[in-house]
Amino acid sequence: MTIWIDADACPVPVREMVLRAGQRTATALVFVANSPLPVPRRALVKTVQVAQGFDVADNYISQHAVINDLVITQDIPLAAEIVEKGITALNPRGELYTEANIRQRLAMRNLSEELRSMGQISGGPNKFGDKEKQNFANALDRWLQKAKKTT
């Protein structure tokens, strides 16, 4: 059981929570990014720096994550690949990607991207605040408890 973190766009508070939870539960963590990450050296914590390029980190995670792992990502196309493989995917706001919601999220992402390119909308996601941190912490704890029961 490993937690894979799509670390380039992962908020620092989420990375910190994952590090604490991984240490507390002796869970392997792999932070994947295309730039160096300030991640402390600890047992069961690995950083993988992939080459620069579009979706290189995503492809690495998709190729290496397996059933019973958790992937933390904001990247909806990566989440769709992960869910299709039967692997659990969670975003930094604490929302699980599932077979029931991933198609809708992908469609909304594509629509937003299209509207942004046409100048119809601007901006990005809402502020990442205390509520989002708490939602993520709760979702991560639920997954860890469930995962520990099945191993």
Swiss-Prot record:
SS bond list: none
Q: What CDD domains does the annotation carry?
A: PIN_YqxD-like
Q: Which PANTHER family match?
A: UPF0178 PROTEIN YAII
Q: Which family does it belong to?
A: Belongs to the UPF0178 family.
Q: NCBIfam families per the record? A: PRK00124.1
The protein, known as: UPF0178 protein Ping_0754
